[in-house]
Amino acid sequence: MQHTHYLKLSKLLITGKLCYTTNDDIYHAMCNVHLNKSLMEQDIRVICQQISQLSWIKGISVRKQWPNVLKIYIIEYEPICYWNDVQMLDKDGVIFQVPIDRINDKYCLPILYGPEGSALDVLTGYRVLYDVIKSTGFTLRSVKMNHRYSWQIILKENIKLELGRKNKVERLQRFIKAYPFFIKNIQNDGRCINYIDLRYDYGFAVSWMTCSNYSDCENIE
């Protein structure tokens, strides 16, 4: 009669709020772990290290259940926005990546852009701008900070705003205040807004785009 101490591991029980993780992910991550060993011979530390290599895994709890079950509890990062199109950020500015075919576009997350190492700065800037705009009826679609610390945002209405390096909140507020009067006076002449440049002490400039992609610029005080 075989002693239970030597029974091979026969079951992995994987639980947690899993949006991106599949059972196959866990099995593949553990390919270097000798699953044909007994439960008591399994090294929990090594198992955690293997699974942690999955970019979207935030935390893992592994427990042994007698006589031959390994219980794995997974905590995933929760994205609040996309980062440079191909990655994601959580609320703490942690960058992670999920297989593209598992990303559900119905969440319509905003997209943030920035140089390497700037994720937390851009996320902080996004939150500041979001607080300004959240009660106005506009929606932030993307926020970008370039290597010169100059800010650009695109609204869900496909309006691009150049905010520049400083006073981005005041400049955004200027646009919000002027927009109802500005849009009211736009004639339906086949033109659409290319972008609005708010990098002025007063007023802003509007770049128009026509069907032939010709752009001209009009200053509005």
Language-model segment annotations:
Residues M1-L13, T21-L39, I44-Q49, Q53, ...:
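Charged, solvent-exposed interaction patches on well-folded alpha/beta domains
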